[in-house]
Amino acid sequence: MVLRHTEHKKKQKMKKHKRLAIVNGGMKFYALAVMALTALTACTNDGVGEVINHETAEVRMTFTPYEMEPMTRANSASGLTRTDGVTRAAVADYATRLDVWIYDGDTEVQAVHQQSTDEGFASLSVRLEKAKTYTVYACAHKAVGAATLSNGVVSWPDDKVTHSFFYSQTFSPATTTTLSCLMERIVGNFRLEVTDKVPEGVARMTVDMGDSPTRWDVGGFGVNAVSRVSSFTPAVGSSPTLSVFVITDGEEAEIYDITVTAYDGEDAVVQQRVFEDVPIRAGYRSTYRGEFFTEAIFSMSFTVSDWMDYETVDF
């Protein structure tokens, strides 16, 4: 009887130890779960539950369209006094749309399309992987719709060229989280200022640039050269100004022969003038000013605005 009682006590102790082991194991599991939950909570942003991946970084970008230099600085090579005044213009002053594309190699990661009426126009934030290297491409312009980027070429609706700027930069979020993107003009401007009055019977005027690029290769040059004719409808009795933007690249001016024609309602020619050897260069404006409808001799002079004006011709 004593032996059986002793064995019974041993069995009870073994059962008790098992229960303690189960309880202790459960407490350890609970403690691990609490630690994991605490660690997860520590990785949230301001307690709102958004988990931050420490393998990524937020990259902020702001865009300005170009750096404006006084004429004396822009032309210091020609003997004018150099000055140091430099200002930057806002994108919204010169563009109504901003299109941004972010690429990982040849793969588009993200595209952002903004309009000047959007809050925060010309600025954005994106979250990208730290371990990768990206390239950002951006185009500011005044086209009626968003630009597209395909196979390294930027194009606009109907291939219509407007006042346009471009920017590209390769960066790594591991070392760069802020980009101040100074955009450059990729167009030159031909401007015709008519000083006499549009006579009765004139229904429209056209500016024929001949063949010129209508798209922009991100490598830094214009492509898709086609014949471009821009049409305008001036009011009778007005002195119109006709303005055409031309995609150009490089440091040298492209030379164009530009034909301007006035038509009546039956598409008969009322007046036509050909402007030969017109220099068109990115960031520069070539202005011709004078009487168009009378038989006047054309002369040339150039004015300066925010563009680094190439030359102005009085005719």
Predicted features, each with a name:
Residues 180-187, 246-251:
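Conserved "repeat-terminator" motif of extracellular CCP/Sushi domains
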Residues 1-13:
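Short, Lys/Arg-enriched N-terminal segments with co-localized hydrophobic residues
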Residues 85-149, 201-282, 312-315:
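Tryptophan-paired
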Residues 39-42:
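C-terminal motif of bacterial Sec signal peptides marking the signal peptidase cleavage site
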Residues 4, 17-20, 45-124, 128-135, ...:
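Acidic/polar, low-complexity intrinsically disordered N-terminal segments immediately downstream
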Residues 115-118, 143-180, 266-295:
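Structured interaction patches on ligand/partner-binding surfaces of diverse proteins
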Residues 15-31:
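Bacterial N-terminal signal peptides that target proteins for export
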Residues 185-203, 211:
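Surface-exposed interaction/gating patches
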